[in-house]
């Protein structure tokens, strides 16, 4: 059994925030694999289903991001899921929009949701780091992650969430590298078509050959000479 945690903040005011891409990914998974309905438990929302032949519990903590570890720890302990079998889906500033990285363990990288989980369960869980890009200035980070995705972001957001769901059985089976590679392949922009070389132009027809008049004068003079020869013969 796996515990798959999507991180975000509860409530409609935060629903489309960049910080809530983990919630969005969990929602797509639950719909794609026809999980049971969301229900309130473990200070969060929980849904159950099967992915790749494995029982999966999806969890969206409702504690607000900074206290996510309370909900994750409560679920993991009640369900007796070891930390090794927890997968956390979260937003990642240091990964480009539309890209992702997968890793096990490591630091929280300034992410308060991960810090909270670390404080309750340690760091040895898997993280799917869903790229949202960086605003370029640390002072802008808080406003950036709590701002809604733009309409234009749907061009990469929808494909990457679909690709994560489509490829999730590979992650369930433990093939983290294969999962990341496959998602990258599914979300890669199409290669531009190479322009075909222009067809070689057919050679221009040779100019018509015009016979030059006999040497020694004009055409009229040539005719006059010929007539003179005829008269002499007579």
UniProtKB/Swiss-Prot annotation:
Region (Disordered): 187-217
A GO MF term: peptidyl-tRNA hydrolase activity
Alphabetized Gene3D superfamilies for the sequence: Peptidyl-tRNA hydrolase
Keywords: Cytoplasm, Hydrolase, RNA-binding, tRNA-binding
Enzyme nomenclature, EC number: 3.1.1.29
UniProt KW Transcription regulation keyword: no
Principal cellular location given in the protein's record: cytoplasm
InterPro entries membership: Pept_tRNA_hydro (IPR001328), Pept_tRNA_hydro_CS (IPR018171), Pept_tRNA_hydro_sf (IPR036416)
Active site residues of this protein: 19 (proton acceptor)
Chemical reaction(s) catalysed: an N-acyl-L-alpha-aminoacyl-tRNA + H2O = an N-acyl-L-amino acid + a tRNA + H(+)
Primary role: Hydrolyzes ribosome-free peptidyl-tRNAs (with 1 or more amino acids incorporated), which drop off the ribosome during protein synthesis, or as a result of ribosome stalling. Catalyzes the release of premature peptidyl moieties from peptidyl-tRNA molecules trapped in stalled 50S ribosomal subunits, and thus maintains levels of free tRNAs and 50S ribosomes.
Protein name stated in the entry: Peptidyl-tRNA hydrolase
Lineage of source species: Bacteria, Pseudomonadati, Pseudomonadota, Alphaproteobacteria, Rhodospirillales
Gene: pth
């Amino acid at each position: 059994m796996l515990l798959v945690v999507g991180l975000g903040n509860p409530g409609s005011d935060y629903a489309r925030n960049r910080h809530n891409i983990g919630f969005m990914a969990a929602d797509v998974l639950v719909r794609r694999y026809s999980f049971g309905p969301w229900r309130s438990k473990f200070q969060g929302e929980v849904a159950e289903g099967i992915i790749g032949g494995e029982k999966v519990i999806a969890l969206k903590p409702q504690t607000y991001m900074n206290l996510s570890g309370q909900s994750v720890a409560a679920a993991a302990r009640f369900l007796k899921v070891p930390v090794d079998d927890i997968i956390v889906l979260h937003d990642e500033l240091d990964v480009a929009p539309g890209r992702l990285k997968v890793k096990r363990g490591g630091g929280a990288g300034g992410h308060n949701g991960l810090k909270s989980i670390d404080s309750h369960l340690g760091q040895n869980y898997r993280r799917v780091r869903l790229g949202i890009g960086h605003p370029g200035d640390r002072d802008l980070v808080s406003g950036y992650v709590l701002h809604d995705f733009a309409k234009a972001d749907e061009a990469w957001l929808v494909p990457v969430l679909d690709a994560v769901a489509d490829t999730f059985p590979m992650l369930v089976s433990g093939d983290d590298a294969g999962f990341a590679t496959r998602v990258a392949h599914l979300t890669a922009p199409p290669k531009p078509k190479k322009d075909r070389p222009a067809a070689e132009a057919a050679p221009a027809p040779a100019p018509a050959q015009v016979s030059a008049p006999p040497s020694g004068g004009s055409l009229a003079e040539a005719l006059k000479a010929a007539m003179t020869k005829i008269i002499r013969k007579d």
